[in-house]
């Protein structure tokens, strides 16, 4: 967890719980490990007596997996297990902004006697490493997690060879609060939905839709919760919001704040 924290600024408390024994991420590996011998074919009645009609499952072969910077370990775990269980080999491409935790985890997995060539990692930028990986003729399937623009580019490249691609892209998830809501509970829920990982997640509740009849009361209490937040070093226990992962995002946030203030918001 500490390695990923140093990569992307995410608090250890938001990383390590899902990696402990019994947590859902590791449980998913047990689940998919149990599926390895469950892929079965099917015999289908044929129309003609001399016809043999059946269905069987076959691995795609080489699968390219593109990982995001905001949750690299978690994304790797839920991508990798089903892919290997189905008999595929994998080439991982972590984000250039958060590669260290993935490289460390790869060392651990390779020590577990995974056969040579089954699990591979390449690092680099999207345009110099990710795009050629997706375009490589030996890659038969692509799994991409990242921003919407990156997903569009990946889908365009994969489509040139009619490669199947699975994508999990960025979102703008609204949090809706209606008049009959428990305001205290709703305020805490809204704060918990946006502040983890500094709001840098595809599941962050980055839009608020509040009924006009409770907007003043809700806003007042939400501001109080925000003022209790501690922004700082993510490795300090007192910190509740770590740093933004890169300067581009940091400056975009400041620009949005500046625009809001110029429009009369405070």
Describe the function of each predicted region.
Residues 41-185:
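Rossmann-like NAD(P) dinucleotide-binding subdomain of oxidoreductase/dehydrogenase enzymes
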Residues 1-51, 245:
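N-terminal Rossmann-like NAD(P)+-binding subdomain of aldehyde/semialdehyde dehydrogenases
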Residues 1, 25-26, 102, 130, ...:
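A general structural signal for well-ordered alpha-helical segments in protein cores
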Residues 34-42, 108-111, 192, 196, ...:
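Conserved helix-loop functional segments at active or binding sites
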């Amino acid at each position: 967890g500490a390695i990923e924290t140093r990569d992307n600024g995410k608090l250890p408390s938001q990383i390590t719980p899902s990696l402990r024994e019994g947590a859902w991420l590791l449980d998913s590996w047990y689940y998919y490990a149990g599926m390895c011998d469950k892929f079965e074919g099917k015999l289908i009645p044929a129309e003609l007596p001399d016809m043999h009609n059946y269905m069987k499952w076959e691995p795609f072969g080489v699968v390219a997996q593109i990982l995001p910077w905001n949750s690299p370990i978690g994304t790797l775990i839920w991508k990798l297990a089903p892919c290997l269980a189905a008999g595929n080999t994998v080439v991982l491409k972590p984000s250039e902004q958060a590669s260290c935790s993935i490289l460390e985890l790869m060392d651990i997995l390779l020590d577990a006697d995974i056969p040579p060539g089954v699990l591979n990692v390449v690092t680099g930028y999207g345009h110099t490493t990710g795009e050629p990986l997706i375009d490589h003729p030996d890659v038969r399937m692509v799994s991409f997690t990242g921003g919407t623009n990156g997903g569009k580019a990946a889908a365009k490249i994969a489509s040139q060879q009619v490669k199947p691609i699975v994508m999990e892209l960025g979102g703008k998830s609204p949090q809706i609060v209606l008049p009959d809501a428990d305001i205290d509970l709703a305020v805490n829920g809204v704060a918990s939905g946006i502040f983890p990982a500094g709001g840098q997640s595809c599941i962050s509740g980055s839009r608020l839709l509040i009924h006009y009849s409770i907007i003043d009361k809700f806003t007042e209490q939400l501001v109080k919760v925000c003022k209790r937040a501690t922004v700082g070093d993510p490795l300090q226990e007192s910190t509740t919001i770590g740093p933004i992962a890169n300067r581009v995002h940091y400056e975009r946030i400041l620009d949005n704040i500046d625009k809001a203030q110029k429009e009369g918001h405070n």
